[in-house]
A protein has these predicted regions:
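Substrate-recognition/cap helix-loop segment adjacent to the acidic, metal-dependent catalytic center
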Residues: 100-128
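Acidic two-metal-ion nuclease catalytic site recognized across multiple nuclease folds
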Residues: 173-207
Length: 207
């Protein structure tokens, strides 16, 4: 079975091409395998009071507990290799990933390429990217909001502690499980969507 990883970043702002990652959380779906770390901003700039209010992450926390970005990225890279195992590909699931988290992830892998060389970084062409925001828009048309918090509320999923990366990951794991089940019912396939993530990717891309 292909490994499915739930991903969330907390960042210093909303620009995925410029802002800093300040927290990474990843979790293998239906498993206790997880990776999380705080990261000192790569730009060496302090995070704003607005970001602290939203996430609960302070500059003091980053200074005391945050890893330097190169160390954090390498640790994440090693963890991805370890959970991929013998599988040819890996699925990475995030909410609003296409416009945000997946862009940050590509930046991480690009930065790692400069440090480690292409032979050691996790191969991006082996990743199947699934954006639960796009999936929800296909499965639940005409909703007033597709924010993760709103969708979790729709499925009665606990969102306590939201806007810390691992808490968001745990909630998103449950949200994706519900969306998978809904897609199973809609497609009425003998082959379960949970065992064939390519079907989810193809469904999202259908016009």
């Amino acid at each position: 079975m292909i490994t499915k990883v739930i991903l969330d970043f907390e960042t210093s702002g909303l620009n995925p091409y410029h802002d800093d990652i300040i927290e990474i959380a990843m979790k293998v779906m239906d498993s206790d395998k997880q990776f999380t770390t705080l990261i000192k901003p790569k730009s060496n700039e302090c995070i704003s009071d607005e970001i602290t209010s939203l996430t609960g992450i302070t500059n003091e926390m980053l200074g005391k507990k945050g890893q330097f970005w190169g160390e954090a990225y390498q640790s994440m890279n090693e963890w991805l290799h370890s959970v991929r195992g013998d599988n040819d590909k890996i699925v990475i699931i995030s909410h609003n990933g296409e416009s945000f988290d997946f862009i940050f992830l590509r930046r991480i892998l690009n930065d790692l390429n400069k440090i480690l060389g292409c032979q050691n970084i996790f191969p991006i062409h082996k990743i199947i990217f699934i954006d639960t925001l796009l999936l929800a828009k296909r499965l639940l048309p005409r909703r007033y909001s597709y924010k993760q918090f709103s969708l979790c509320k729709f499925f009665n999923i606990n969102t306590e502690g939201c806007h810390r990366a691992m808490n968001d990951v745990i909630a998103l794991e449950k949200l994706y499980f519900n969306l998978e089940n809904k897609l199973d019912n809609e497609l009425d396939k003998r082959r379960k969507v949970s065992q064939n993530p390519e079907m989810v990717f193809d469904y999202i891309k259908l016009k």
